[in-house]
Structure formats: structure tokens, C-alpha cells
Regions:
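Short glycine-enriched nucleophile-adjacent loop
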Residues: 158-170
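Short amphipathic alpha-helix adjacent to the substrate-entry channel of hydrolases
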Residues: 88-105
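Gly/Ser-rich "nucleophile elbow"/oxyanion-hole loop immediately N-terminal to the catalytic nucleophile
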Residues: 67-71, 118-156
């Protein structure tokens, strides 16, 4: 009798797995990365040069465009979420930004999970200033174009990005022309991440505050606060945007708090996923490494999780790269920087335009749910 029950259970499980597989195969798939335009895979550089400097909470990485190596390039400060000290968590996004011709500075700002919050902003500013000085004076680097300076951050880094824009002038940093805070938080008790006086953000800056409709961790509280408190930035230079989840196909597009992460092992600092202080302290601080990063022109390497393809690892499914990146955060920030630096592609980032709201099309021709854009959050 037990043997018969076991066989029956095994048969049932096999049928269930088969049914799920067939159902998944019949489900529409999400859009892949567009060929051109903001968020697209038309890159001006084929590889990325990676350098790591500093120590403890003042450590930072510099990622520079290569193949070909430009004489100069705009500078983007990328600020990770709490605990995201390892660049691998945002590696695919960093790769995208650098191959578009930008230098990316990635401040660590916290040695480990025990670093006091009060140290985050001083560590960030120190790292940025040191990185810019190194880029300007140390041989072999791409020269930083300090007239084209931007900041982007996710979660706690979204608050820090807004702070960088507000404190740039008094801190001796270049003027921030574009700033995007993605699912920022948390300035409320008991976390109490300090938020600078955002009235100091100059009116010529372009600003986006972004929330996810399934972000149950930070919600939209601080995104709204950043939008509302940046009072000198006129409404036509900023937008409040909500990423909208869509489960029309498989895998679904879920705008959770982890949606903006973009896992890529090519950007692993050596600490791995959730690496501790022991690995951090044992790492190289000044070596360089040129690597091709994620090749989006052909087959995507397994080191990067792509949500538009099958076989995503369940453990890291919330860090997959998908249309919420290509048509959401990546497109928006590309357009914002293009508008601020070169006076083009503004319609992809600002103004509640069709290009800004568009999120691609499922494989069955159904449009992905559009972004929600407002200037009255």
C-alpha cells in the first residue's frame, strides 16, 4: 500500500510539473532590451575598465568606458541600497551606463551592515571627491567631464543621491545636472536616514523620484518627499513616477523593492552575495581589470539574470534584469542624462509623454502596463 501511494504521488507530481511547464511555454514572454534609444543595447564602448580604491567605508569603485577609450566622459555617481556594497547587485545597470560612454563612481559608504547611518553621507562625499581627484590626476584614466555630472541611487542610495545633488556646491563637487532617486528610503523612524535641505538642488537640475507599486518596504513616502521638497526645481524639470507591475505573461514584471537591482557576476567584488567584512578586508584595493561585461548583442551569459528568458534562478529572481529595467529605470535615467548633458531624448524621461510611459510589448502583442507619471503626487 505505501508503495502504491508513493507511485501515485510521484505520478501526480510529474504531471503537475509537466502541466506547469506547458502552461509556462504557452504564456507570453516579456519584452527584451530594445535595440536602440534610451535603455537600449546600442553601445559606444565594448568593454569596461574596473578599479577599486580606498578603504573601509570610504572605499569606492571607478568603472570607465573602454574599447575605444574616450578622451573624456561624463561622470555618474551610483549609490547602492543598504547592504549592497558589492557592485554585483547592480552590475548589469552599471555595465549599461559605462558602455553608453559614462564613467561610474560607486561609493561603498558602509564597511558592513554595522556601519552607523550617520557615517553614510560623509563617506559618500569623501569617496566621490577622492575618485574625481584620482580621475583628474592619475595617469591612465579617462578624463572626467565635470560639466556633465549626475547621481542615481536605489533605496537608501536614493536618499543619498538626492543629498549629493543638494550638497554638491557646498561640498566642492560639480553641479549635479541629473538626479534620479529610485524607491528611496527610509527617512522615517526608526531608520531615520538624514535627508538634506533639498531646496539647495538648483532649478536647472532634472529630477526623477520613482516608486514601485509593489514596494512594501519603503513604499512611496520618501519618493514623494524628495519630489515635493526639491522646491526650486520647476515642475517641467521633474516627475514623480510609479513603476507598475504586470503579470500578463511569464515571468511576470513585479515592481517590488528589489526590482531595480541588476545582478551581474562580472562585477563581483570578491565578497559574493552577502559577503562579510572578512572578505571585504581581504580584497584588492587598487587593481584594474578590463572585461566585456554582459554581452547583449548575442546570447546573454549565465552570470547575468535576465527575466525575459526562461530558467531564472529562484534564489535571485528578484534581481533579474527585465523590462522594468530596460523600459523603466534604465530608459528613464538614460533619457534624463541625455537631456541634461546633450539636450536630447528629454521625452523619454520627462513630461508624461508616450515615450516616457511606454514599457514595451509582450510577445503576444499586448502592451506592458505603462508607467504612471504625475507632477502632483
Amino acid at each position: 500500500m505505501p508503495g502504491r501511494i508513493t507511485k501515485t504521488l510521484a505520478l501526480f507530481l510529474s504531471f503537475a510539473i509537466f502541466a506547469v511547464t506547458i502552461l509556462s511555454a504557452q504564456s507570453p514572454t516579456p519584452p527584451s532590451q530594445p535595440a536602440t534609444g534610451p535603455g537600449g543595447k546600442q553601445y559606444v564602448n565594448a568593454s569596461v575598465t574596473k578599479n577599486r580604491y580606498g578603504k573601509a567605508g570610504e572605499e569606492y569603485w571607478i568603472f570607465e568606458p573602454a574599447e575605444p577609450k574616450p578622451a573624456s566622459a561624463p561622470v555618474i555617481v551610483f549609490l547602492h541600497g543598504w547592504g549592497g556594497m558589492n557592485p554585483l547587485y547592480y552590475g548589469a545597470w552599471i555595465d549599461h551606463l559605462v558602455k553608453r560612454g559614462n564613467i561610474v563612481i560607486y561609493p561603498r559608504y558602509q564597511l558592513n551592515l554595522l556601519t552607523p547611518i550617520r557615517e553614510f553621507m560623509p563617506n559618500t562625499l569623501t569617496a566621490i571627491k577622492d575618485a574625481l581627484a584620482r580621475l583628474r590626476t592619475e595617469p591612465g584614466h579617462v578624463k572626467p567631464d565635470l560639466t556633465k555630472f549626475a547621481a542615481v541611487g536605489h533605496s537608501l542610495g536614493g536618499v543619498l543621491a538626492a543629498n549629493v545633488a543638494a550638497l554638491a556646491s557646498e561640498s566642492g563637487l560639480p553641479r549635479v545636472l541629473a538626479v534620479m532617486s529610485v524607491e528611496p528610503g527610509i527617512t522615517e523612524p526608526p531608520i531615520n536616514v538624514p535627508l538634506a535641505d533639498l531646496k539647495k538642488i538648483p532649478p536647472e537640475a532634472l529630477l526623477l523620484a520613482i516608486a514601485g507599486d509593489q514596494d512594501t518596504l519603503v513604499r512611496d513616502v520618501d519618493a514623494k518627499r524628495i519630489y515635493k521638497e526639491s522646491t526650486r526645481v520647476p515642475a517641467n524639470n521633474k516627475d514623480f513616477i510609479t513603476l507598475v507591475s504586470d503579470s500578463h505573461g511569464q515571468p511576470g514584471l513585479i515592481a517590488s523593492h528589489r526590482a531595480p537591482t541588476a545582478f551581474d557576476l562580472a562585477y563581483d567584488s570578491g565578497e559574493g552575495i552577502g559577503g562579510g567584512p572578512a572578505e571585504v578586508l581581504g580584497g584588492n584595493r587598487g587593481g584594474s581589470d578590463s572585461a566585456g561585461g554582459s554581452d547583449r548583442a548575442g546570447g546573454l551569459p549565465t552570470r547575468r539574470i535576465d527575466g525575459s528568458r526562461e530558467g531564472r534562478p529562484d534564489r535571485l529572481e528578484t534581481m533579474m534584469v527585465n523590462a522594468l529595467d530596460f523600459y523603466g529605470t534604465w530608459k528613464l535615467f538614460d533619457g534624463l542624462c541625455d537631456a541634461a548633458f546633450y539636450g536630447k531624448n528629454r521625452e523619454y524621461a520627462l513630461g508624461n509623454t508616450p515615450q516616457q510611459r511606454f514599457m514595451g510589448v509582450w510577445s503576444d502583442g499586448v502592451p506592458v502596463k505603462e508607467l504612471k507619471v504625475t507632477d502632483k503626487p
